[in-house]
Amino acid sequence: MVKIRLRRTGKTKQPSYRIVVADSRSPRDGKFIETIGYYLPTRQPKVLEVNADRARYWLGVGAQPTDVVVKLLKRVNILDEQGKVVAES
């Protein structure tokens, strides 16, 4: 199964995350298929950048986002409150 999840990068105690598409059997920071964005929670304000076209593509072909990624995708209006993909505007 293909998942959309966070891959931790950055220094100790200064995490940053890449939003990646990966096989669910791969380790958290291991092999991945594609990077579709990044999230910097330590910056003020927090920085979130997502390639909406690629995120919609992967969701359309059946990739399952993790719970945290669902919240992030809702924040950038790729998913609606029910978790369904929002049409491109």
From Swiss-Prot:
Listed transmembrane segments: none
Keywords: Ribonucleoprotein, Ribosomal protein
Keyword Ribonucleoprotein: yes
GO MF terms held by the record: structural constituent of ribosome
InterPro entries: Ribosomal_bS16, Ribosomal_bS16_dom_sf
Entry superkingdom: Bacteria
An annotated GO cellular component: cytoplasm
BP-aspect Gene Ontology terms: translation
Pfam families in alphabetical order: Ribosomal_S16
NCBIfam families for the chain: S16
HAMAP family assigned to the protein according to its UniProt record, in alphabetical order: Ribosomal_bS16
Family: Belongs to the bacterial ribosomal protein bS16 family.
Record-given protein name: Small ribosomal subunit protein bS16
